[in-house]
Amino acid sequence: MSEFTHINHQGNAKMVDVSEKNISKRTAIAHSSITVNSEIYKQIVEHTNQKGNVLNTAQIAGIMAAKNTADIIPMCHQLPLTGIDVTFDWQENEQSYTLNIQTIVSTTGKTGVEMEALTAATAVALTVYDMTKALDKSMVIGETYLLSKSGGKSGHYQRQDN
């Protein structure tokens, strides 16, 4: 079993020293979702929400969240992100609609951007909830997970669907 890298010799939390790691291009792709009712779906796609364009605002929130991940996740390094993209795909269910969210975050650096991609995806879903909760508070934010990552010593990871 490998040692935990975020624990020092006294058993306390520490931020890992990455100064000896090689610089490489690193990319992470994350997924989240939010399921809404037909009234909220209609409001989002027709841009009639009183707070503004829901998806544009959520995209900006995701970008801001990725850029500020180190401020809210204690052991994350501040990274010079080189790219952040947020995309959406609607899935119609029997009596609801699911907004699938994908975030892609890239950097050229000494540590990966998985947490930035996951934080962005989560912030997007939370922003959609915040902007539409006046209509229905029973929305469900779905699973959030890492789809893939590339770069670094551990190489490529691709999530396998079960």
Curated annotation (Swiss-Prot):
The active site is at 130. One of its GO terms (molecular function) is cyclic pyranopterin monophosphate synthase activity. Pathway: Cofactor biosynthesis; molybdopterin biosynthesis. Its EC number is 4.6.1.17. It comes from the Bacteria. One of its GO terms (biological process) is Mo-molybdopterin cofactor biosynthetic process. It is an enzyme of class 4 (lyase). Substrate binds at residues 75-77, 115-116. The keyword Lyase applies. It catalyses: (8S)-3',8-cyclo-7,8-dihydroguanosine 5'-triphosphate = cyclic pyranopterin phosphate + diphosphate. InterPro entries: MoaC, MoaC_bact/euk, MoaC_sf, MoCo_biosynth_MoaA/MoaC, Mopterin_CF_biosynth-C_dom. Keywords: Lyase, Molybdenum cofactor biosynthesis. Homohexamer; trimer of dimers. Catalyzes the conversion of (8S)-3',8-cyclo-7,8-dihydroguanosine 5'-triphosphate to cyclic pyranopterin monophosphate (cPMP). Belongs to the MoaC family. This is Cyclic pyranopterin monophosphate synthase. The lineage of its organism: Bacteria, Bacillati, Bacillota, Bacilli, Bacillales.
